[in-house]
């Protein structure tokens, strides 16, 4: 199919590229300075407050770094007539770890879903098999990130969290792409909705920061 590239597409691509470059240069790189200083400290020098500051800075560094590169790729594609899929969907607004992984590094999670999770049976072969499939996918995701025991532990950590959420949250029959946490919240009174939403966001941010 012939690609159509006009002034509007080029302008949109340039804007998106500049946004991505700004994320990388003005936020991610600045955060990286603080993160490097914190990570360079000995355990004896690192107090609780400094550890949390370093963890939060790293949380923002990795997001603005990676999403910045993704924005630049999307913008560059627009300039040449390509439409690349979005790779991030405001992941830090998620109210569960499962929802977080629907919003973070979407290209990677989509690949694992299509070529590993679904072929393993997805959620079609009972609760126990679903739990195993989710855990195994995250274990493989950890190994994909690097052949190091830290990445294996990372994969196990997120695999266990998604297993726990799947096991504990009572799911309704899905309406479109609704996830389990959203289904649970939809069934609660208004005041509980607010509480559960805030609690879900806090839990997810803590879980992602730690892991």
Model-assigned labels for residue ranges:
Residues 1-211:
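Membrane-embedded transmembrane alpha-helical bundles that form the catalytic cores
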